Amino acid sequence: MNNWNSITIKISREAEEAISALLIEAGSAGVEINDSADYLNHEDQFGEVLPEIEQSELVDITAYYPENMPIVELKAEIEHKIANLADYFSLTGLSVTTNNLSETNWAEAWKKYFEPARITHDLTIVPSWTKDYLATGSEKLIRLDPGMAFGTGTHPTTKMSLYALEQVLRGGETLLDVGTGSGVLSVAATYLGAAEIFAYDIDEVAVRVALENIELNPGHEKIHVSANNLLEGIDKKADVIVANILADILVLMTDDAFRLVKEEGYLIMSGIIADKADMVIASAENAGFFLETRLIQGEWNCLIFKKTENREGVIGG
């Protein structure tokens, strides 16, 4: 058995994926997320008895670190990095606490919480260590290592991105995946028929994680991963651009996205908390896109925009 230290961050829901990525980059073996919305939005289809949960706008994100890592210094470093993100999401209610987990073999024990999850009609996320799960019918298996975080496919923003890709991909497309994280959307795009995928992330750790996950799946030769800040300096024209990142970051890329999306092509934007959806819509429409579809799950929005002169069938067209 090994001893572990944990750092738990209570923060606004919209910051969940960004903070998870920050904690992984700081050396965590993985993160655990406790969100009241997961219980409140759960459909009681199988007679489960769920705990009574008080609704909150905050989530608890817990990261686990080996005991030999200097937890006091690490906590201070993480607090400093979170403070630098204040322009992107609310820090109201923020708290950062630590705990020692004596004699806990967390590095292996946490894996029991991750099981294969059917995300869409055809796409199922399977943990990399699950070897005996077999696809049935039209089911496609996306193998990921959830311990790498950066999105495992089960978060509402990622789920809706996958639904959106199913909706717009017909086969043979060139796709740009901005802020690729785990690489899950790029892998899904290969299964859905995209001919060539270019995946970008500003974080070198995310680039490494994406490459490792992509190698676990067939079709990885179609995916090209590199470090880049959004779409700056990119000149590759695309049929589809997808980005599942913070709303305040999404609005910085709409002009570049319009420049790169081919006529009749699509821009998929997810990771958008409800009260920032109008801001993202305005930014994309000002760039020249039309809103075609709006997906909503709980407080999260996923927006599908189209670059077209024919406004028939688009929202407001």
Swiss-Prot record:
Q: What is its EC number?
A: 2.1.1.-
One molecular function GO term is: protein-lysine N-methyltransferase activity
Is Secreted among the key words of this record? no
Keyword RNA-binding found: no
Q: Which Pfam families match?
A: PrmA
The chain's disulfide connectivity reads none
Its catalytic activity? L-lysyl-[protein] + 3 S-adenosyl-L-methionine = N(6),N(6),N(6)-trimethyl-L-lysyl-[protein] + 3 S-adenosyl-L-homocysteine + 3 H(+)
Residues holding S-adenosyl-L-methionine: T158, G179, D201, N244
The entry's localization annotation reads: Cytoplasm
Q: What class of enzyme is it?
A: transferase
Query: What InterPro entries does the record tag this protein with?
Result: Ribosomal_L11_MeTrfase_PrmA, Ribosomal_PrmA_MeTrfase, SAM-dependent_MTases_sf
- GO biological process assignments: methylation
Q: Which CDD domains match?
A: AdoMet_MTases (cd02440)
| Keywords per UniProt | Cytoplasm, Methyltransferase, S-adenosyl-L-methionine, Transferase
Predominantly, its location class is cytoplasm
Gene Ontology CC terms, in alphabetical order = cytoplasm
Q: What does this chain do?
A: Methylates ribosomal protein L11.
The record's similarity note reads: Belongs to the methyltransferase superfamily. PrmA family.
Entry protein name: Ribosomal protein L11 methyltransferase
